[in-house]
Amino acid sequence: GLADRPIRWLVDDCAKFVAREKRRGNTYDGIIMDPPSYGRGPGGEIWKLEDCIYDLISQCEEVLSDTPLFFAVNSYTTGLSPAVMEYMLKTTLVPRFGGETSCDEIGLPVLMRPSYVLGGQNMIVAYTKADVIEYMGVITEHVDMDHPVLLDKYILGTECEVDAICDGENFLIPGIMEQVERTGVHSGDSICVYPAQHLTQAEIDTMVDYTGRFARELHVNGLVNVQYAVSNGKVYVIEVNPRSSRTVPYISKVTGVPMVDLAVRCCLGEKLADMGYGTGLHPNAPYVAVKVPVFSFEKLHGVDTQFGPEMKSTGEVLGIAPNYHDALLKGLIGAGYTFKTPGPASCCIFTVKDSDKPEFVDIAWKLKSMGYKLYGTSGTCAWLNKHMVPCNEVRNMSGESPNIVDLLQSGLVDYVFSTSAKGRDPKRDSVRLRRKAVELSIPCITAVDTANALVDCLRSDHSLENIPLVDIATLYHRK
């Protein structure tokens, strides 16, 4: 919440807190303030910490004169600008995606984003030059153009995330998290698995090495978050955030490493080696924990449900089990996904972009073998039939009745699988289809990897009745 508030509010809140605690007779050795690198002002404008850090310090000294104040910031924390990021990657010898000023130089597809992004807002993957032109209009309409629009090469791969604690010299990684959805889906909207299930030991060692380099180069005394992409065995860095992240509570809970406590002690000058949790990569827990995002699309009218670089989830649930598939099933059920035995007339609808069609053949075949009747729009239907998966054609949203809307309203559709090749225009048939599914409370899957995870759980003979309950407090000993 603080990222959306003017900087002086941080000072005022801090001063009020200290005054209230003093009245109660409580005193403190000091206060650690970790203000966001940038946020939105009262008029919606982007402000950067680097522009007001000295003003913030002077205000804090004035109102907190007798209480020591520790800032969890350093020379880089005030927002890793593209130039600073590029310099750091060169000095640490870590590879990254190519970044230029023209999509002709980079090569399509490209990730387009404003210089300063909150929650992936207005970040888009462009697959064609027409997409670049269309999306540039979207970005410039909503973003202050005092800062450039950035282009990065988009590489399809597995996305992983690391939260680490550093004392300025040594570092501790409680665990490496792997996302089910591939790169291009915001980490907050992706299913997240700990420990990582599909990384080689060499890839894990590389991430640990790179994270240590970043922590030392940034002179971190506290927390740092790094996001990686793995493609064809090579590890690339997506972004480095010298701050806490939304995954800290998750990874702390499932590993038993109290990250915030340790980070605070590092801020105050203690060393990780003296804290009892070791350094480097912490040993994996004896179970699997799956974090599944929760969405509120039924309350957000007009919002497209298609996954992408812009975050849309409003919460998350946690599934824990001895193995990955059981933990995933728990998480999906907790997030509101329904798992039911198909009836004699139960059906699924497929309408997917060309690049996803090959991967959806296996998904469709699995659903067909379970007893579902399959329907698809013209292109998807033709593709599935061509590859020996019986499918019935259904007219799209703008077609004559009976069309896909009538089928959705029939009460027979259990799942909709819809992926778009185009933008977010609410008048597009694909966007209208997904919104209609939301209105009718029909699960709508918009990513290949999510579809694979869902179908694997549907085919499993496990249910909540035969998956053991897990008491997380008994799985490790808190220190």
Feature locations, PLM:
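General beta-strand structural signal in soluble alpha/beta enzymes
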Residues: 112, 125-126, 151, 175, ...
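Local beta-strand N-terminus motif with an aromatic residue
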Residues: 27-29, 108, 413
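C-terminal substrate-binding/active-site "lid" region of AdoMet-derived donor-dependent transferases
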Residues: 44-106
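S-adenosyl-L-methionine
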Residues: 1-30
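Conserved proline-anchored active-site loop of SAM-dependent methyltransferases
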Residues: 28-42
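Short internal beta-strands
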Residues: 349, 367, 371-384
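ATP-dependent carboxylate activation and anion-phosphoryl transfer catalytic cores
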Residues: 119, 127-343
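Peripheral docking tails and interdomain loops at the edges
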Residues: 121, 395-479
